[in-house]
Regions:
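Hydrophobic beta-strand segment of the Class I
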Residues: 34-35
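Conserved catalytic/acceptor-binding region of the Class I
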Residues: 47-48, 54-111
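Short catalytic micro-motifs in class I SAM-dependent methyltransferases
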Residues: 38-41
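Short, small-residue-biased leader/transition segments that mark boundaries at the very start
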Residues: 1-2
Length: 111
């Protein structure tokens, strides 16, 4: 709600959606820019999420991601907490993997 009110105050015509990054309700090549700030990294199925990101951004469009890295402070916290928590569901990727450039390149392939 805060973002909506800030956009309206600035006269920006922005539409905000909340949905499932693994199954976005948008057409192919619909956006010039697709961005995720600490969002897509929590999708359990990294391949499905990356496929959707690549599908909805137009050819030549931009994809911007902000994600935690495995080597930073949050990565250290994940390692520590991981010793005391049950493992993630089978097949679920670590959110920290999105902070690894090689992983993201592999997910997106030639996209």
């Amino acid at each position: 709600m805060l973002f909506r009110s800030q956009a309206a105050e600035r006269g920006l015509h922005i539409h905000f959606d909340v949905g499932d990054v693994e199954a976005m309700p948008y057409g192919d090549d619909q956006f010039d820019v697709v961005s995720s700030t600490f969002g897509v990294m929590f999708a359990p199925n990294h391949s499905a999420a990356a496929g959707e990101l690549a599908r909805v951004v137009r050819p030549g469009g931009r994809l911007g991601l902000a994600c935690w890295t495995p080597d930073g402070g949050v990565g250290d916290m994940f390692k520590l907490l991981g010793r005391f928590q049950p493992p993630p569901p089978e097949g679920a990727g670590s959110p920290l993997a999105w902070g690894n450039e090689a992983h993201v390149r592999e997910l997106l392939g030639g996209a």
